[in-house]
Curated annotation (Swiss-Prot):
UniProt-recorded name of the protein: 4-hydroxy-3-methylbut-2-enyl diphosphate reductase
Organism of this sequence: Petrotoga mobilis (strain DSM 10674 / SJ95)
Binding residue positions for dimethylallyl diphosphate: 40, 76, 126, 219-221, 263
Entry superkingdom: Bacteria
InterPro entries from the UniProt entry: LytB/IspH
Pathway the protein contributes to: Isoprenoid biosynthesis; dimethylallyl diphosphate biosynthesis; dimethylallyl diphosphate from (2E)-4-hydroxy-3-methylbutenyl diphosphate: step 1/1; Isoprenoid biosynthesis; isopentenyl diphosphate biosynthesis via DXP pathway; isopentenyl diphosphate from 1-deoxy-D-xylulose 5-phosphate: step 6/6
Binding site for isopentenyl diphosphate: 40, 76, 126, 219-221, 263
Source organism phylogeny: Bacteria, Thermotogati, Thermotogota, Thermotogae, Petrotogales
Cofactor or coenzyme needed: [4Fe-4S] cluster
Length: 284
C-alpha cells in the first residue's frame, strides 16, 4: 500500500487565525460568542462548543447579558449593518474576516462607484456572499452560478473566493458569449490557497487508485475537491473523519491519495493516517 498526502492540508491561514483567536480568548474567559458557524466542520464545532464557544446565527440568538461579553466574527465576513448592531450588543467585537474576502468587498465597492455593474460568480446563500451583499450597492450587483444575459453594458466580473478555478473560467467564457458588453473587467478573485489545493487534488487523483477527500460534508471547498478527484479516480470518498474508513474497502495494492478541505483540522488528518498505517502494517 502506498500513501500520498497533499502538501497543503489542514486549515487555511484565514480559518487558522480565527480558530487561534477563539482558543486564545477562551484562556481568559469561560465563554465566547461566534457569529455564524466558524467552519463547515462538525468536529471542530463540537470541540469549540465543549471549550465554551457559543455560536449565534442571528440577532435573535443574542442573550440579554451580552453587553459584558466578547464576540468573534468568522472569516466569511458579515454585512456592515450586522457589524454595527453587534458592536452595540457586545463589549468587544473581534473581526476575523479573511483579508482576501475584505479585498473583494473593497474592490467591488470601488468599481461600483466607477459605474460598473458587478456580476459575481458564486452561491447566493453562501455566508461570504451574504456579507458582500450587505457591504455594497445591491442594485448594481448580480450573484449567479449560471451565465445569464445582462442589460448593463459596463460590467465587472468577479468570483466568490472559494469557487473552482476551472468552473469560473467556463462561466466567464459562457457569459461573454451570450452578452455584448461595451466595457468589461474580469478579475481573478479566487483564493490562491483554493487554487493550489485544486491543482494538488488533480495531480494526486490521476496517479491514485483510491482518493480520500477529508472535510465537512457541508464544506463548499471540500465538495469541490471531491468533484475534481472523482473525474480521474472513480474510487474517491468524501469523509469527515477517520471513523468512516471502516466502511471503505482498501487493498494492499492501493495507491492512496489524501487531500483536505481548508476547514479540516490537522488532528483529523492524523487520525486518518494512523488508521491507514495500521492497515498497512496488517497487510504486511
Amino acid at each position: 500500500m502506498e500513501i500520498n498526502v497533499a502538501k497543503r492540508t489542514g486549515f487555511c491561514s484565514g480559518v487558522q487565525k480565527t480558530y487561534n483567536e477563539v482558543k486564545n480568548s477562551l484562556v481568559d474567559k469561560n465563554k465566547i460568542y461566534i457569529y455564524g458557524e466558524l467552519v463547515h466542520n462538525r468536529k471542530v464545532i463540537e470541540e469549540l462548543n465543549s471549550a465554551g464557544a457559543i455560536t449565534i446565527t442571528g440577532m435573535d440568538d443574542i442573550p440579554d447579558d451580552s453587553i459584558d461579553e466578547t464576540l468573534i466574527i468568522r472569516a466569511h465576513g458579515i454585512s456592515k449593518a450586522e457589524k454595527d448592531l453587534l458592536k452595540k450588543r457586545f463589549s468587544k467585537v473581534i473581526d476575523m474576516t479573511c483579508p482576501i474576502v475584505t479585498n473583494l468587498v473593497k474592490y467591488v465597492e470601488k468599481k461600483q462607484k466607477d459605474g460598473f455593474f458587478v456580476v459575481v460568480y458564486g452561491k447566493p446563500d453562501h455566508p461570504e456572499i451574504l456579507g458582500l451583499k450587505g457591504n455594497v450597492d445591491e442594485s448594481k450587483l448580480l450573484i449567479t452560478l449560471s451565465p445569464v444575459t445582462i442589460p448593463q453594458k459596463k460590467v465587472l466580473i468577479v468570483s466568490q473566493t472559494t469557487m473552482g478555478e476551472e468552473e469560473y473560467k467556463n462561466f466567464i467564457t459562457s457569459i461573454l458569449t451570450i452578452n455584448s458588453f461595451t466595457e468589461v473587467l474580469i478579475r481573478d478573485t479566487i483564493c490562491s490557497e483554493t487554487i493550489l489545493r485544486e491543482k494538488e487534488t488533480l495531480e494526486l487523483s490521476q496517479k491514485s487508485t483510491l482518493m480520500l477527500v477529508l472535510g465537512g460534508k457541508n464544506s463548499s471547498n471540500t465538495q469541490k475537491l471531491y468533484r475534481i478527484s472523482k473525474k480521474y479516480c472513480k474510487r474517491t470518498y468524501h469523509i469527515e473523519s477517520g471513523e468512516e474508513l471502516k466502511e471503505i474497502t482498501i487493498s494492499p495494492q492501493d495507491k492512496i491519495g489524501i487531500v483536505t478541505g481548508s476547514s479540516t483540522p490537522t488532528s483529523e488528518l492524523n487520525k486518518v493516517l494512523e488508521y491507514l498505517s495500521q492497515e498497512k502494517e496488517d497487510f504486511s
